[in-house]
Amino acid sequence: MIGQALGQLAERENHEVVAYSRRTAKSGTGKQTWISTAEHPLPETKLDALVHLAGENLLGLWTQAKRERIWKSRVELTQKIVAQLKTWAPENRPRVLLSASGVGYYGDRGDSVLDESSSRGTGFLADLCEQWEAAASEAASLGIRIVHLRTGVVLSRGGGAFPLMRRAFACGVGGRFGSGKQWMSWIHEQDQVGLILWAIQNESVTGPLNLCAPGVVTNADFTRQLAAKLRRPAFMHVPALALRLLMPGMGQEMLLASQRAVPNSALRSGYSFAHPTLESALAALI
């Protein structure tokens, strides 16, 4: 979803895009498409920037097998990519590697305001993001600038969580999760891809980058605004205990955890958000 949107934006701005995909038809963009395999995820070609967004979908029951797929598709794949970059001719290596991560890095932090300098939290996602970022950082030894894309909930018509949420609310069964007091860091797809392209072009951007809008809201406020925009009720609510029992791990870390992440690095560096508030984002989506 994000890779395709990013490629389309880059092409509109006259950049040449090389898409790496396990399936040619899925790339959806790029004058060239290279087929990635488990052992050779990154066939060599000359690049200025490499954006690595691959990873097993986090949604679903976090069985042991699911957790292993999540880990391998992020940490181990990133390790393989960096290992391959080390074999490339120096003139072909990208000047910058932008590697996906997430605000799950911060763990469940209540009302604490979290910027890029905030410490790592605890939990499966925090451990995952730490090791994921560490794997990408190994490319710095090659003289490559590293940017860790700590992404919040991406709001997009094209996929991810938003179409599921919209469908639930449209059917009148939308509502808050648990108390609803947990902070929910989100970003509109337009700003997600805009920030990535902006980070490619701005050499001062390095290290962690929170990809989330300035207007962070609680889950209860998100619920209220989405219901109002759809003109639907939002009386339902899913008790925290039910989420923990029905979705072990995922329920606590993705739906109940509170991450009040703010995009300090982007704002300090001069990025202008197209949708800084949830009201603006929902107006564009609905």
Annotated model-derived regions:
Residues 26-80:
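NAD(P)H-binding glycine-rich loop region in Rossmannoid oxidoreductase-like domains
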Residues 79-123:
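Conserved Rossmann-fold NAD(P)-dependent oxidoreductase catalytic core, especially the SDR/UDP-sugar
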Residues 101, 134-157:
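Conserved beta-loop-beta element that borders a ligand/cofactor-binding pocket
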Residues 121-124, 152-159, 179-189, 200:
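Glycine-rich "substrate-gating" loop/helix at the edge of Rossmann-like oxidoreductase active sites
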Residues 130, 142-144, 155-164, 199-209:
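Glycine/proline-rich active-site loop of Rossmann-fold NAD(P)-dependent oxidoreductases
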Residues 166-174, 182-217:
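Alpha-helical substrate-binding/gating segment
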Residues 202-249, 283:
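Mid/C-terminal beta-alpha module of Rossmann-like enzyme folds, strongest
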Residues 252-286:
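C-terminal amphipathic/interface module of NAD(P)-dependent oxidoreductases
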